[in-house]
Regions:
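Flexible "cap/lid" loop of the alpha/beta hydrolase fold
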Residues: 119-123, 130-160
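Conserved HGGG/HGGXW glycine-rich cap/lid loop of the alpha/beta-hydrolase fold
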Residues: 22-77
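Gly/Ala-rich beta-loop-alpha elbow adjacent to hydrolase catalytic centers
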Residues: 110, 114, 118
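Short beta-strand/loop motif that positions the catalytic acidic residue
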Residues: 218, 224-226
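Conserved alpha/beta-hydrolase catalytic His-Asp/Glu region
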Residues: 24, 143, 160-217
Length: 277
């Protein structure tokens, strides 16, 4: 089957930048209001996702803040080198990505794997981070779940049926996941080296240094957001992340693993309230 490489248009300019020798695609939202507001927010997607996964919350957030949203190396439409993906590799990539774009201070919103990356980055760069927002971050979970297993199956065998099944199980209310999200994932996982990058990243998270005892290094205000019915990374795994000093956990009712897709209005309201404090 042919791969549809059409990039969804969500009214944000697509940009390319070279980082560590790799071409990295990113979206950039900015306007006159956000130019006066010096706060930059960088959004980091989960494993197997892309910058476009955030499209449901960007129009509202971009009214107040400049947004930078990369396709993390190995994902989306960025380069997918056949290297060993480790958390150190991703942290170095993110540090150099920010340097290349001239971002010296930022707030970060990270989902799942992107939340884990944001956490690792912040532990070593707290002086650069104003606020940290983590939506069901990975890193604490060491045992797979049935929902994660289905997602892995969809990544390795990206048929429409497998992909739809995985996303319906990931969300609490299956109909909250748009068809575009399902087809975009399916198409991207058929791109060269996409499966390799996915599995190498999965192993990187599994083999990473544990978080316990290290989270106290984070000294920036932190918001944890979890879906009440998250079957991918269940709510129980939030306990380890609450070791972050000055952290707050907010539960979104009737929601699964992707609150910014399932409950974008509630997610945005929660985020904006936290950022404005």
């Amino acid at each position: 089957m042919d791969v549809d490489t059409h990039l969804p248009d969500y009214n944000a300019p697509m940009n390319l930048v070279e980082v560590n020798g790799y071409n990295i695609r990113f979206l950039h939202y900015s306007n006159k209001n956000t130019s006066r507001n010096k706060t930059t927010i960088v959004l980091l997607h989960g494993i197997g996702a892309s910058a476009d996964r955030w499209s449901y919350i960007c129009p509202a957030l971009s009214k107040y803040y400049q947004l930078i949203i990369p396709d993390i190396v190995g994902f989306g439409y960025s380069d997918k080198p056949t290297v060993e993906y480790t958390m150190d590799f991703f942290v170095r990539f993110f540090e150099n990505f920010l340097t290349k774009l001239g971002v010296e201070r930022l707030s970060i919103i990270g989902s799942s794997f992107g939340g884990f990356l944001a956490t690792e980055f912040t532990m070593g760069n707290s002086e650069k981070v104003d606020k940290l927002i983590l939506a069901a971050p990975a890193g604490a979970m060491r045992i797979s779940t049935r929902t994660l297993d289905q997602y892995i199956m969809a990544a390795l065998y990206p048929t429409y049926e497998n992909t739809k099944r995985a996303f319906r199980d990931m969300a609490h209310e299956p109909n909250t996941v748009p068809e575009d999200t399902i087809r975009d994932f399916m198409n991207r996982m058929r791109l060269p080296n996409a499966k390799y990058a996915f599995m190498s990243t999965l192993l990187a998270m599994r083999d990473s240094q544990g978080l316990s005892g290290r989270l106290s290094k984070i000294n920036v205000p932190t918001l944890l957001i979890w879906g009440e019915y998250d079957r991918m990374i269940p709510l129980a795994y939030s306990k380890e992340y609450t070791e972050i000093p000055n952290s707050k956990l907010v539960l979104i009712n009737n929601c699964g693993h992707i609150p910014f897709v399932e409950k974008p209005l509630e997610f945005n309201n929660t985020v904006l309230k936290f950022l404005r404090v």
